[in-house]
Amino acid sequence: VMDIPRPRWHRLPADFVGCTLINNGGYVVTKNEQKNSAEKKDSENMHAEPVNEVHSSLYQKVIVPKKEVNKQPPSKSRIKKPAVSSENDESKGNKSIQSEKPKQAFHTKHKAPKQPAPAKQKQSGIAKSKKLNQCQKSKRTNGKKKPSIKAYFLGGLNEIGKNFTLFECEGDMIIVDCGMAFPTDDMLGVDLVIPDFTFVEKNIDKIRGILLTHGHEDHIGAIPYLLKKVNLPVYGTPLTLGLVEGKLKEHGLFGKVKLNVVHPGESIKLGCMKIEFIHVNHSIPDAVGLAIYSPAGIIVHTGDFKIDCTPAQGEMIDLGKFAELGNKGVLALFADSTNAERPGYTATEGKVNASFERLFKRAENSRIIIATFASNISRVQQIINCAVKYGRKVALSGRSMLNVMGIGVEMGYLDVPDGVLIDLDLINRYPKEKIVLVTTGSQGEPMSALTRMAFADHRKVEVGPGDFIIISARPIPGNEKTVGTVIDELMKRGCEVVYESMYEVHVSGHACQEELKLMQGITKPKYFIPVHGEQKHLRKHAGLAYSMGKDASNVFIGDIGDALELNQDYMKKLPSVPAGRVLVDGLGVGDVGSIVLRDRKHLAEDGLIVVVCTIAAGDGHIVSGPDVVSRGFVYVRESEPLMDEAKRLVNLVLENCAENNIHDWSTLKS
């Protein structure tokens, strides 16, 4: 029996027993039962499970039988009966096949062959192609359109954050993730950015639920704002819903929304779609990918993922499930593109743990302050483990850090021995070398705990010589300048600062190029759609698909507002739908738009001059004033001649208006 090299996720047909090498270099297949009918073979080729591209030529060589095999004509019982003449019966038959195997490309009835199968097996590829075209034509004449699934991209494309996607099939819709984004530097006074929910509100009767892949802000941050407009059931893993629950309490929605806990490996039914949750590795526990089983075919959404063989918490990503889906036939793969520019593999979380061990030894006489993402529970667990090992107490700083860690401890995702965690107010009662402070601010956020420490604005923590600061995070694109400013300020105060580019104190939670190619290789999708990234990330990810042989017509690089329709025959772009961004400023949601931002920018750049004057309504003479008030324009005490000249000009204009009997307020302003 020939030992065929293949990846372990690759599967040969169920009736394959082995193969024997013969003199001319070919292989003879041993099967439980040979299927030699030409018609049957065509049908099998149409419905065969996809084969891994690396071994496809070898696989085809193995399954093609030689002349010497199967000299006997096929059994009549293995031949499909001719299609019934009744039009209704034929349509019913097609419908039955669709319900059993919705992912298959062709569903047609075949007449019984008049000749034995071996005589038909020599037909050329052109003849087979003609036969397939006839099948397609037959299908079209049935008058029934193949089921399709639509995807609406309302966020997460050409940007980092604000992930928000809708899928629709046969009148049923589901939402995948509902995240927020951080404001850019030109969004003055804006707290956060959320998706535009107009399209959701218009289709509320079709939407069956919200599916969350994990608990990061760019995937759950906008949930409260959406649920204030529409009441929908939410599905997610325990930690993800624990974080959502905290947000609902802040917004007064707790108890008004149905939260449904699911676990990896479980499935739910929403309308015509079945959704299976698949365990993946990420920088937060309880992250999942999604397999969406629809009448049109299987959609795989990876969520945020990487392949980590030694994760800090939990198990390795369930590659077996993704491979199983690939063997069933995946219509489309929607995959994380964040690290598509980075070659190789993402480093394992175990490397960070080893770095912490070395740095704790190096800073044995210093107070250690570590800034990381509040949601990175596994990273905090590693810090706590090192603190326990080296006899240090742990304190937390930052509102989000306290909230997330509280949820983590309550739900059992954090293991903190008794007596290790202390209140921030008590840190000065212990020697510096006995303290580890875990804080927010790894992205240089203006009001974060680490930023306030750097600018001596923190009420409880004062940093200086003797402090060893570790920034255990990589700057999000766009935050490099603010992070650099914080590092500079800390160093000016005498702190020793360690960050990612000089030490392995952070690893990404997103897959790099080789992992992304592996995901495409085992899922073997018909269509590929890169998501979760800026334009450069999406295009680089698409380039990886091209390098693996994917045709450009089967790859879609989208933008916010795009709509896409997919089925077994085609992928086409639909007219755009309402989408965009909504700015949140304090309690105001959507009050700030482009015009307000433009005015704020002008005020910030040019300053403000206001003229205050009281004018009599009757004859228009000046009752009091004018007073000229300036903010951000010039320093008044050093510019008194300029301000006096401004008052003189205002008086002159008002006197001219009074002489010409102009009392209209709008005219005076102009």
Q: What residues fall within each predicted segment?
A:
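Intrinsically disordered, low-complexity RNA-associated tracts
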Residues: 21-143
